[in-house]
Each structure stands twice: as C-alpha cells, then as structure tokens.
Amino acid sequence: KSLGVATLIDGSQGAVHMPVDVQEIGCDFYPITGHKLCGPTGSGAIFVSAERMAEMRPFLGGGDMIKEVHRDSITYNDAPMRFEAGTPGIVQTIGFGVALNYMMKIGLKNIADYEAGLKDYADKKLTALNWLKLQGQPNEKGAIFSFTMENAGHAHDISTILDKKGVAVR
C-alpha cells in the first residue's frame, strides 16, 4: 500500500467462515461470491475503498450510470451507480440478500463451531485408519482433508467408492 499498489483480498473462501472488517484489514478490494454463502450463482458483492472508487472509471455505458450526455462528453453518475450499466441481476441480488440473512440468522460462529466439530470427528475417524495417511497439520487446516492411500488403485476408483458411501470428493 505504501507504494500505491492496490490490494485485493479474495473473500470468497473466508467470508463464510469468519466475519471480516475490511477497514481493519485495510484492503482496497474485497470480493465475495454469493454461491459460497448459500446464494444463487452469478451473485456476489465487492467492497471497494473510497480512494479506489474515486479513481475508477466505467468501462461500459448506459442506463442510470449516466447523469448527462452532451454532443462531445458524458457525465457519469456518482459511485456506485456509475458502474451499473444495464439491467442488474435482480433475482440474483434478492437471492443473495436472502442467503446473507439466512447465514446471519444462523450465525457465523455457530457455523464455524459446527464445522469444527465435523472436522474433529472426521479427523479422529480418518486417523484411526491405518491404511490411510492424512496430509497437513490437524489444527492448521479447514474442514477439507487431503490424504494418501498405499496400494489403493486409481484415484477415480477411490472417489467412486467414497461417493457411493456419501463422501463428497474432488
């Protein structure tokens, strides 16, 4: 930041797990993805600092983003409206709002606590399997598990077997 370089922190993964104070972390941009917060695909939001918002110019034109049109010039609306060219994704925006309300009603701490319980349970069960080796440090990872298996065959075969048992793999 001291060199004038814009900072973007991708909040898509973390926003569902913890509250974030964008003022405290001091970033210029903080985008979040709606579908990772139980919202519809194609929805999301982005925080843009006032400093960066003032520097940005629209790359499209039309709709309510334009305040005045003259023969030789265009005056854009104030931010954030100057970035709203065309019809917004109304259904996605409403769905995203409902999803955020749902997440807030449950509570991010409650979600994190429940996820931690699932992680601990899975860690305990998987650690007990002598033919499977977990990768990473148990206390330093989220609820995604990477593992290796000796003489297990092809990864696709393993994922098919796990899928039939109700375990989501990627």
Regions found by a protein language model. Give the residues of each.
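Pyridoxal 5′-phosphate
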Residues: 1-170
